[in-house]
From Swiss-Prot:
Binding site for ATP: 51-58
Domain of life: Bacteria
Native organism: Streptomyces avermitilis (strain ATCC 31267 / DSM 46492 / JCM 5070 / NBRC 14893 / NCIMB 12804 / NRRL 8165 / MA-4680)
Gene Ontology terms: biological process: cobalt ion transport
Family indicated by similarity: Belongs to the ABC transporter superfamily.
Name the UniProt record assigns to this protein: Putative ABC transporter ATP-binding protein SAV_3608
An example Gene Ontology molecular-function term: ATP binding
InterPro entries: AAA+_ATPase (IPR003593), ABC_transporter-like_ATP-bd (IPR003439), ABC_transporter-like_CS (IPR017871), ABC_transpr_CbiO/EcfA_su (IPR015856), Co_trans_ATP-bd (IPR005876), ECF_ABC_transporter_ATP-bd (IPR050095), P-loop_NTPase (IPR027417)
Length: 262
């Protein structure tokens, strides 16, 4: 739990984008995936969630917008507890971009895919079109508005998938392996887009150089707990920590030689 502010200290300007406290969860078959996860992400931060397969990363992400509930502990998004009472608001505030963009693109055109969420939330007319146009502009896909998604490249489809989430104007953008299956040019384009967004980002990835490039801070989730929380470059340069949690950098990659961008 977070300690109360000392007497006489100024009140915080706003609640953090995400506050996870004591989160534990077991599946119905008895498998315990999370054992008490604690962390917070401030507004505007870009944070990488790292960890080996089976660490509990997917289980954690599915708690952030209430897809999974019922374990111990709490998840709070922009001051709202994740639960039935606030579920509609939470799902607008937490946008998840899945690893496979085809899981999110199912309408005949790019425009219809991006409009789907806001339209379901009640937007219509000029307000809806403005929301769609703004989201497509943010990912550099405005010129493809009338195209069928299946006619686009994989990298373009991933950018449209990001736009479908941005159209909901989320508090937090959660990305699951955003660099997977991208060629170098698409990888660079997506990185530039993510850096330009005025939104909190939580990036789940095994791509450690991409995490270093985009996220000043990283969390290592291992065996259902946060094993480390710190500056990405410092964590990746800690050989003992990396080995302990089965994380490996590409051959020849030295995080100490990389200058972090903003």
């Amino acid at each position: 739990m977070n300690s109360p502010a000392p007497v006489g200290s100024p009140a915080p300007v706003s609640a953090p984008s995400l506050d996870v406290a004591g989160l534990a969860f077991a599946y119905p078959d008895g498998h315990q995936a999370l054992f008490g996860v604690d962390f917070r992400v401030e507004r505007g931060e870009r944070v990488a969630l790292l960890g080996p397969n089976g660490a509990g990363k997917t289980t954690l992400v599915l708690h952030l917008n209430g897809i999974l509930t019922g374990g111990a502990g709490t998840v709070t998004v922009a001051g709202l507890p994740v639960g039935k009472r606030h579920m509609a608001q939470i799902r607008r505030k937490v946008g998840i971009v899945f690893q496979d963009p085809d899981d999110q693109l199912f309408m005949p055109t790019v425009r219809e895919d991006v409009a789907f969420g806001p339209a379901a939330a009640g937007l219509t007319g000029a307000e809806l079109e403005a929301r769609v146009d703004r989201a497509l502009d943010q990912v550099g896909m405005a010129e493809f508005k009338g195209r069928p998604p299946h006619h686009l490249s994989f990298g373009q489809r991933r950018r449209v998938a990001v736009a479908t989430v941005l159209a909901m104007e989320p508090e937090i953008l959660v990305l699951d392996e955003p660099s997977s299956n991208l060629d170098p040019a698409s990888r660079r384009e997506l990185a530039d887009i993510l850096r330009s967004l005025d939104v909190t980002v939580l990036m789940v990835t095994h791509d450690l150089p991409y995490a270093l490039e985009l996220c000043p801070r990283s969390l290592i989730l291992s065996e259902g707990v946060i094993a480390a929380d710190g500056r990405t470059g410092e964590l990746l340069a800690d050989d003992t920590l990396m080995r302990a949690h089965r994380l490996e950098l590409p051959f020849g990659f030295d995080p100490r030689s990389v200058t972090m961008g903003a």
